[in-house]
Each structure stands twice: as structure tokens, then as C-alpha cells.
Amino acid sequence: MNLQLGFEVELNQSFDQAIDTVTAALKTQGFGVLTRIDVQATLKEKINADFRPYVILGACNPSLAHQALSTDPRIGLLLPCNVTVEAVDNRRSLVRLTDPGAMVNLSEKANEMQELASLGHQKMAAVAAVLQAI
């Protein structure tokens, strides 16, 4: 499913397996995972709230990030690209991937970065396609 800000894919995989699958799919398009926020553990620790298994992965394609930051350093406010993985149940997980193209459009220099926006969109769409094929 194509969302306004990204893509959404449901996987028939456990939460932990889905995280590994998403990480591998991101690598196929040059994205690495820079950060991993365990939302469930953080909410439990900070406010003693129970929450379903949910992680936010900070994904970065160094080449795209370099080009974007060189054009508009303020784009760093939107980096890295967030990818969320959440458990639907024990056998299914929901993945949402930020569309780098949509992020670039928030920049005051969006017109200068349209080619980059298109490339970022294509790469993340390819990641979503890899996941949908599973």
C-alpha cells in the first residue's frame, strides 16, 4: 500500500523475523540501519505503559543523504528515514517505510532536489516491493 508519506506492507512473519527481513531488504537498495528504538521497552521503562512489540529503525542511504544535505542542510531535521515494524499478532507484522521523496518535498529547495526525490522514492518503493513479494 502506498501512503502519502511512505509505504505500508504486512508480512506473514513474526516480529523478530520481520525486523531481520526489513533490514535485509533495505540493504538491497543501499540503506543501512543507523538507529533502533524499541518503543515497547522504552514506554515500559519511562512510563510503565504496556505496548505491543514496535520498533522504529532509522534507515540511511549514505549517497542520498550526502546529496540532500549538500543541497539543503536543514534536510537533516528529517533524517534518517524512519521505518517502523510492529507486531499484528504472533505470525504477522506491519511495516511502514518513509518515502524519501516525500521528505525532500518539505524542503525549501525541493525544486532543486526533484531528481534526488525521485531516486529516493524509487529506492524505497523497491524495498517495499521486495517485502511485498515475500
Language-model segment annotations:
Residues N105-I134:
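Well-ordered alpha/beta subsegment
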Residues G32, D38-T84:
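Compact, glycine-rich, soluble single-domain proteins
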Residues T84-A110:
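Beta-strand/loop substructures that line and gate deep hydrophobic ligand-binding cavities in soluble
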Residues M1-Q29:
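Terminal, regulation- and interaction-focused segments at domain boundaries
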Residues N2-L3, K27, A49-R52, V88:
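Short glycine-enriched loop/turn motifs at secondary-structure junctions
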Residues T28, E45-K46, V130:
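Residues at alpha-helix termini
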Residues E8-E10, T21-T23, L34, A41, ...:
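Amphipathic alpha-helical hairpins
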